[in-house]
Design a protein with these regions (language model features):
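A structural signal for multi-pass alpha-helical bundles of membrane permease subunits
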Residues: 1, 5-8, 12-207
């Protein structure tokens, strides 16, 4: 369940957030400024404030399942993704895109063949950050999935602890579970460490 939720969220969020950030960074209009402000403002709203209304809505539309969890993660993650990608795209020279247009590329070709390769470090950075958030999150899966058969890894570890009772702790089961939980994050970080560091430090020093 954890892999399904994380992969679905990362694919959808990366596509929509990168496309939206590209439009915000390149289209100098009042509407784009307002849209950018709304994304930034959404980051300031604590989850606890909107927690109960969201769960109530999901229950009414019968989405207290993995699909509803993916939708919520995508909605919560897109604000930070747009914010980070907008700043990164602004550091990319616009002349590269204009040269592609002169060579006959349309707007979709410019986005997929020019922008996506250029912003790959930031895309990988956001995937790792959001992946860590989803992998370690407990509250949202607990509220959405509850006691359903499809549980995330954090919920499984929690229920392993609860099966031992109030004063029991099955350490022989908990320790291997926690180790298995952190190994994928370590492997992913080691594989994409170069891109992650490049994405985090982007824009820190002016050239």
């Amino acid at each position: 369940s954890e892999c399904l939720v994380g992969s679905e969220m990362c694919i959808r969020d990366r596509f929509f957030s990168s496309l939206c950030a590209w439009m915000i960074a390149r289209r100098k209009s009042r509407g784009m400024k307002v849209l950018y402000f709304l994304f930034v403002a959404a980051m300031l709203i604590p989850f606890q404030v909107i927690m109960y209304p969201l769960i109530s809505i999901l229950e009414k539309v019968s989405l207290k399942n993995l699909v509803g969890l993916i939708i919520l993660y995508t909605g919560f993650g897109i604000s930070m993704s747009v914010f980070m990608m907008t700043g990164y795209i602004k550091s990319v020279p616009k002349d590269i895109e204009e040269s592609a247009v002169i060579d006959g590329a349309n707007i979709l070709q410019v986005f997929f063949y020019i922008m996506i390769p250029l912003i790959k470090p930031m895309i990988i950075t956001i995937i790792i950050l959001n992946g860590m958030w989803i992998w370690n999150d407990y509250l949202l899966p607990f509220l959405v999935l509850g006691t359903s058969d499809l549980k995330t890894l954090t919920l499984e570890i929690y229920y392993v602890k609860m099966t031992a009772g109030q004063y029991g702790s099955p350490w022989e089961t908990l320790f291997p579970s926690v180790l298995i939980a952190i190994l994928p994050l370590i492997v992913i970080f080691l594989l994409f460490q170069k891109h992650f560091v490049k994405g985090v430090t982007a824009g820190a020093v002016k050239s």
